[in-house]
Amino acid sequence: MFAVIKTGGRQYRVAPDDVLEVGKIEGEVGSIVQLNEVLVVGGDTPILGLPTVAGASVAVEVLDHKRGPKVIAFKKRRRKNSRRKRGYRDEITVLRVSEILTDNAKPTKGPRPKKEKVAKEATKEDAAA
């Protein structure tokens, strides 16, 4: 099953367990957020929305908030000794799709538990250094 969602003025084709980067969405890291602008729900019998599918939503887990790569906007007017250089970095939210819901259903899955980092065991080479 897949869905086409709209967020931040862009459209994304998503399936369960997909990880995607979108424009900033409010929500704490590790929380579940519902995206209600679902344009298409696909599967055995696809449902097209006009413009959105009624009662459909996508539950996503917020994995991280970060900043995107730097974008440079450089303008130059030739022979005029006029130039302007500006740059910016977008705020990005990293999401993992938990479930695709239809018929006003509530999300059944909660946030996934975080994996604990395993500490390296000291070896003879590390002790000698």
UniProtKB/Swiss-Prot annotation:
Residues 116-129 have a biased composition (Basic and acidic residues). It holds the Pfam family Ribosomal_L21p. Residues 102-129 are annotated as: Disordered. GO terms for biological process: translation. Keywords: Ribonucleoprotein, Ribosomal protein, RNA-binding, rRNA-binding. GO terms for molecular function: rRNA binding; structural constituent of ribosome. InterPro entries: bL21-like (IPR028909), bL21-like_sf (IPR036164), Ribosomal_bL21 (IPR001787). GO terms for cellular component: cytoplasm; ribonucleoprotein complex; ribosome. This protein binds to 23S rRNA in the presence of protein L20. Belongs to the bacterial ribosomal protein bL21 family. Part of the 50S ribosomal subunit. Contacts protein L20. This is Large ribosomal subunit protein bL21. It comes from Bradyrhizobium diazoefficiens (strain JCM 10833 / BCRC 13528 / IAM 13628 / NBRC 14792 / USDA 110). The lineage of its organism: Bacteria, Pseudomonadati, Pseudomonadota, Alphaproteobacteria, Hyphomicrobiales. The gene is rplU.
